[in-house]
């Protein structure tokens, strides 16, 4: 319960979550099942949905019910929503671990390419060394 969170040399410890400039992607997509894909994206931004979905490979998904999405599609919607908020940094907490290995590798490569294109720094938390090596420019290993 002590310490500070600094981003771009600014202490953001006491900022409201939505004002910190940090995007989050979790192991399982955090989406609102009663909302459409577009409804979920509206939580981050009222516009830019078509472009965001195109960037993550989901063109035409705006009206789909999130409950009918596959795991990979759900992660892509979560990514689109996080990026619509234009975060200063994106935190990814085991985002590929619930996906099968082929889909995981494909999504990992797509996310890496998209983040590089947007010049958005990211921190990936993973237990998978190969995943870390494929995704990262630098790796920090934590233990105990």
Describe the role of every protein-language-model region:
Residues 48-61, 67, 112-116:
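Conserved ABC ATPase "signature" region
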Residues 119-125:
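Conserved H-loop
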Residues 86:
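Conserved catalytic motifs of ABC-family nucleotide-binding domains
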Residues 4-27:
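ABC ATPase NBD coupling module
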Residues 79:
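Hydrophobic anchor residue at the start of the ABC signature
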Residues 65-69, 73-75:
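Conserved ABC ATPase signature
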Residues 90-94:
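Catalytic Walker B motif of ABC-type/P-loop ATPase nucleotide-binding domains
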